[in-house]
Regions:
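Membrane-embedded helix-loop-helix hairpins and adjacent transmembrane boundary segments
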Residues: 1-396
Length: 396
């Protein structure tokens, strides 16, 4: 969030951005703990709260002691195992479906597994569900995580030049498209498979794939893949804890401190933050586990659009306009936050689709931020230009 300070000359905006990111990460880490632990609990009979505590403690320990380097390597190893495992699961699933992949594509076409019956391609009302709004909303959510989420951005800083960064981004994009395709095919494949076979009694809405892994895959591979899912969740947790610690130390503590913090002091603060935030995320995850979440996928995407949408709106305001200033950006941030809280908690869920959250946040940021900045400049006689490299107009 150093960018916000550079672009708008405001420590306050940098701190606000960091606080919003930390809120997002706590919610994200909580859902990441909740999902695999609910699945393993239903399959093993172990209390879900105990599994959440164990997962959280392990993630806290190696985030606390290992730092970013350990996080990156565990991410790579566990991610590789998970990628290979789910790809194998897809091929194994296809081999045991009567008709193979052709049956899956038939389900796409005839059983509304590609588009729901009541889901139009386009709806002029952007507050309602449509394929267009899902694509645009998901696109802005993804853009928000790549532009304004410290856990993603900190990976960029590990590269040594833009050539390697571009290569990393292209590889990431290709793998993301591949793994998303694999999971969507698995989802429809499971629907077809359980039309042809009995559904295990333990399988709930968010647990069908895990039930398939446990009851249908070869025994040795079942244990490996379930362990990989659990480990990958721990790895993602440690990434979140590490990024929260870095953001708190550099974007909040260092900005608010009257004297410069030594490297040793920053490290110690980061470790304490990892511990405190980790414990808090464990508590929130236990609340989710006992709160009857209907669809974790929809809950998380709604939460992501709610929080990251506000952040990405501020980043877009800064990067794509020259007129935006501290006053306008701060007012836009506050207005977008107020509007989104109002929509989330005071508007019926069926009136506004979760995929519109980020679109609304960005629109409010621009509609409020640009006029407010122009009025402020006119009143104050401010003719200052943005710092070099902070907008698309000053990047050369």
């Amino acid at each position: 969030y150093h960018y916000l300070e550079l672009r708008f000359g405001s420590k306050g905006l940098r701190v606000l951005g960091a606080v919003m990111f930390i809120i997002y990460q706590v919610g994200r880490m909580s859902i990441i703990m909740y999902l695999p632990c609910m699945v393993l609990s239903s399959l093993t009979g172990i209390n879900v709260n105990l599994l959440i505590v164990i997962m959280g403690i392990i993630a806290i320990i190696y985030s606390y002691t290992g730092g970013l380097k350990s996080v990156l390597w565990t991410d790579f190893i566990q991610g590789s195992v998970l990628l290979i495992g789910v790809t194998f699961s897809l091929f194994f699933l296809l081999a045991h479906i009567d008709g193979g992949i052709g049956t899956i594509f038939h389900a796409f076409a005839t059983e509304h597994k590609f588009l729901a019956v009541d889901q139009p391609i386009f709806n002029p009302n952007i507050l309602k569900d449509s394929v267009f709004i899902m694509i645009v909303g998901a696109g802005f959510n993804t853009m928000g995580s790549y532009v304004s989420s410290q856990d993603i951005v900190q990976r960029f800083t590990t590269t040594t030049d833009t050539k390697k960064l571009n290569k990393m981004m292209l590889t990431n994009g290709g793998l993301s498209i591949f793994i998303a395709t694999v999971f969507y095919l698995i989802g429809t494949g499971l629907y077809v498979f359980y039309q042809q076979n009995a559904l295990p009694p333990a399988a709930a809405q968010d647990q069908i794939f895990a039930s398939y892994i446990a009851f249908e895959l070869p025994v040795g591979f079942t244990g490996l893949l379930l362990a990989a899912i659990y480990a990958a969740a721990q790895s993602t947790l440690s990434t979140g804890l590490n990024s929260v610690a870095a953001s708190w130390t550099l974007d909040i503590q260092a900005r608010l401190s009257k004297k410069e913090l030594s490297f040793e002091k920053q490290t110690k603060i980061g470790q304490y933050v990892s511990l405190i935030v980790g414990i808090f995320a464990i508590v929130v995850s236990m609340v989710l586990a006992n709160g009857g979440v209907k669809s974790a996928y929809e809950w998380f995407n709604g939460f992501m659009g709610l929080v990251l949408g506000i952040l990405i709106g501020t980043f877009i305001l800064g990067a794509f306009t020259k007129v935006a200033n501290t006053f306008g950006a701060t007012l836009a941030f506050i207005a977008a936050s107020a509007v989104m809280v109002g929509i989330k908690y005071f508007v019926p869920a069926e009136d506004v689709t979760i995929w519109s959250y980020s679109i609304i946040s960005i629109a409010v940021s621009l509609v409020v931020g640009i006029p407010a900045s122009m009025i402020w400049r006119k009143v104050k006689g401010d003719t200052s230009e943005p710092a070099k490299y902070t907008t698309i107009y000053t990047s050369k």
